Amino acid sequence: MRKKSGFTIVEQAIALVPEFENVVRKLDQQVTLRGQSKSTLNNYIRRIALCVVHFGRLPEQIDPEEINEYLVGLARDPKSPSRSSFKHMVYGLRYYFRLMGMNKNAIALPSLKKDTKLPIILNTKELKALFAAPTLLKHRIVLTLVYSAGLRGQEVINLKISDIDFERKTIHIRQSKFKKDRIVPLSEYLASGLKKYLQAENPHIWLFNGKEPDGRYSVKGLSWVMRESIKKTSISKEVSLHSLRHSYATHLLEQGINIVTLKELLGHASIITTMIYLHVAQCPLIKPHSPLDRLYNFTKDEDKV
């Protein structure tokens, strides 16, 4: 988040309130010790920095009523950032106050209802058009990989060349969102394209090299590839890179995979998260029947609704 001045909002907050630099350092230490997500931390810090710049003080130096009035103003302002940004502001302040050992009862931050919006799914025709849109082989491979294995953006940029096992046709996802490794199938169709990509690009260590300090690609870069590719198609749906993961899950359900297996493939912590795809998957309905008929293969075409 970089303002017209050329300084990020965090840099502006530190310049205005120098003590905020110690806060950033303390938050970073806590997230590292707890093994929590760095991307979530960065979102929290940016939102807390906005609050610091607005008031010119650290959050614990601000009257709780002032903070709540500020949040109400943000929620009502049509020019305010997205609901996701607002949530990061609230969650970030909660995390900050817990870290400072402040009384929860003194800070009546709003409780946020979870979004019940159903995921937007791309159909097979749209997916084929999307995968054919990028000019660069690297970009075509990236988009196809996300859909083929249902990966999160962070999981894609974390992939190393050694995580791809062409012989066993598997992809090793290491330390994903919930710090758990998992193995997902490598599409045979994608495998041949990956080999061509590796031969042409000759990446080192990371499967997708980029301009990040450690040499890997960035999630922002992935999102840019998705946006630019969408522009080259006739797709009018409001989709993002994560829509490819949604499409993967929905299409697997429609192809008959059971929801427990899908949960493991997606790396969800709870099956409740996975169950949202039951609302968008167009699975064929089967009439109630006796298992005895299946036992003796006594079925009729009328079984299907």
Where are these regions (language model features)?
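Conserved catalytic core of the tyrosine transesterase superfamily
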Residues: 1-305
